[in-house]
């Protein structure tokens, strides 16, 4: 029926229509088959490719992480060895420095002792030489005094004057 340009269908929206249900089901199955044939395969293939790429990236990341951890452990070991070696070198250098210092001090002490000994010996020689010289002068003066006394048989006052004169001569010779 047609009333004022509007077609009124009989039945409501909630009333089951077997023809509509059949054609809806057939259309759904056809669309499902078309999607399965043309879209489902490529979509699943793309998803599988993406999954493989992600898994490959994860595997590479794990491998890189393991390699980095191994390198880090190796670097830590090398650093520990280098620290130990540096400490050993410093300790050996310190020991060598101490030994060298002790050797230098001992050598300087030995040289100082030698120099002191040499200086003492030289002083002793100079002292002996001066004493020998003094003895010779005293002996010469005594001989001269004895000569003068013997030559001049003089009285006590003159002898005292001669001895005083000799003492003055002795003082002059010493200076």
Swiss-Prot record:
Instruction: Point out the coiled-coil segments of this chain.
Output: none
Q: Which UniProt keywords apply?
A: ATP synthesis, Cell inner membrane, Cell membrane, CF(0), Hydrogen ion transport, Ion transport, Membrane, Transmembrane, Transmembrane helix, Transport
Kindly list the GO molecular function terms attached to this UniProt entry: proton-transporting ATP synthase activity, rotational mechanism; proton-transporting ATPase activity, rotational mechanism
Primary site of residence: membrane
An example GO CC term for this entry is: plasma membrane
Q: Which CDD domains did the record assign?
A: ATP-synt_Fo_b
Q: Does the keyword Cytoplasm apply?
A: no
Superkingdom of origin: Bacteria
Residue ranges of the TM segments:
20-40
Per UniProt, subcellular location reads as: Cell inner membrane
According to its record, how does it sit in the membrane?
Answer: Single-pass membrane protein
InterPro entries recorded: ATP_synth_B-like_membr_sf (IPR028987), ATP_synth_b/b'su_bac/chlpt (IPR002146), ATP_synth_F0_bsu_bac (IPR005864), ATP_synthase_B_chain (IPR050059)
HAMAP family of this UniProt entry? ATP_synth_b_bprime
Subunit structure of this entry? F-type ATPases have 2 components, F(1) - the catalytic core - and F(0) - the membrane proton channel. F(1) has five subunits: alpha(3), beta(3), gamma(1), delta(1), epsilon(1). F(0) has four main subunits: a(1), b(2) and c(10-14). The alpha and beta chains form an alternating ring which encloses part of the gamma chain. F(1) is attached to F(0) by a central stalk formed by the gamma and epsilon chains, while a peripheral stalk is formed by the delta and b chains.
Q: Which family would the database say this protein is a member of? A: Belongs to the ATPase B chain family.
Q: What does this protein do?
A: F(1)F(0) ATP synthase produces ATP from ADP in the presence of a proton or sodium gradient. F-type ATPases consist of two structural domains, F(1) containing the extramembraneous catalytic core and F(0) containing the membrane proton channel, linked together by a central stalk and a peripheral stalk. During catalysis, ATP synthesis in the catalytic domain of F(1) is coupled via a rotary mechanism of the central stalk subunits to proton translocation. Component of the F(0) channel, it forms part of the peripheral stalk, linking F(1) to F(0).
List the protein's name. ATP synthase subunit b 2
Which organism's genome codes for this protein? Prosthecochloris aestuarii (strain DSM 271 / SK 413)
Name of the gene encoding the protein in the UniProt record: atpF2
């Amino acid at each position: 029926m047609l009333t004022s340009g509007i077609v009124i269908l009989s039945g409501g929206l909630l009333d089951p229509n077997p023809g509509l249900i059949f054609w809806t089901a057939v259309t759904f199955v056809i669309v499902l088959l078309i999607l399965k044939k043309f879209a489902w395969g490529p979509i699943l293939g793309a998803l599988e490719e993406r999954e493989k790429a992600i898994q490959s990236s994860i595997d590479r990341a794990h491998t890189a992480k393991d390699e980095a951890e191994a390198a880090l452990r190796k670097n830590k070991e090398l650093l520990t060895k280098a620290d130990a070696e540096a400490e050993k070198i410093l300790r050996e250098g310190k020991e060598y420095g101490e030994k060298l210092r002790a050797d230098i001090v001992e050598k300087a002490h030995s040289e100082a002792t030698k120099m002191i000994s040499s200086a003492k010996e030289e002083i002793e020689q100079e002292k002996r030489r001066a004493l020998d010289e003094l003895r010779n002068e005293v002996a010469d003066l005594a001989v001269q005094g004895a000569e003068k006394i013997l030559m001049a048989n003089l009285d006590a006052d003159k002898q005292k004057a001669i001895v005083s004169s000799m003492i003055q001569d002795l003082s002059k010779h010493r200076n």
